[in-house]
Amino acid sequence: RLWGSVAFVIGSALTGKLVSMFDYRVILALLTLGVASMLLGFLIRPTIQPQGASRQQESTGWSAWLALVRQNWRFLACVCLLQGAHAAYYGFSAIYWQAAGYSASAVGYLWSLGVVAEVIIFALSNKLFRRCSARDMLLISAICGVVRWGIMGATTALPWLIVVQILHCGTFTVCHLAAMRYIAARQGSEVIRLQAVYSAVAMGGSIAIMTVFAGFLYQYLGHGVFWVMALVALPAMFLRPKVVPSC
């Protein structure tokens, strides 16, 4: 995940610079280049195949999935709120900041700053959170979310935007690390199934749904949409799993 973040830093800074030099049509060219590169990457087969003992296939019917959700609903609700609260940021922060007078390149650098903070936390996570449970880390992420989205709704002053972007390491990275720690503590095939649900629901579904709502809210509330995102993150403080086994 760390190296994906490094690539994002380079890509966001480069895109902002190119948009400033040319126009927004360069985004389509970069997207096309990126998709073509991904296709070439998919065509390269790994030279070393994964090895391991075969495992007995466990039931993965609807009953197993429903049981998984019932057992982990607090965790799933918590991460959905925390990740879903990023929807307004992902969808409208660039528009919001440019309307406040920032250039496309400045917006690109701000986005890069957030992911630089993310990379640093990923790299130091073993040392920083060695004694923290997933429950503790989710609390940290929720607090960062309320603070970050509240600041975004209150000001567009550059010093505060720098703080906002540094807090990305708390709102996203710490939440993701907490999720990985929680999932890794499961047993057997539950790890795989819970990872799949987390990726589909928290990292995908919640952001998609919240982006739709954020669009309507941004149209009518403007910067007030970020205050709403702060309220979305707030309940996560109280929905954290009661007991989370340590890794």
How would you describe each model-predicted region?
Residues L18-S20, I120-A134, Y218:
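Helix-to-loop junctions at the C-terminal end of transmembrane segments
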Residues V26-I44, G224-K242:
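Symmetry-related core transmembrane helices of the 12-TM Major Facilitator Superfamily/SLC fold
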Residues G153-Q165:
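Helix-loop junctions at membrane interfaces in 12-TM secondary transporters
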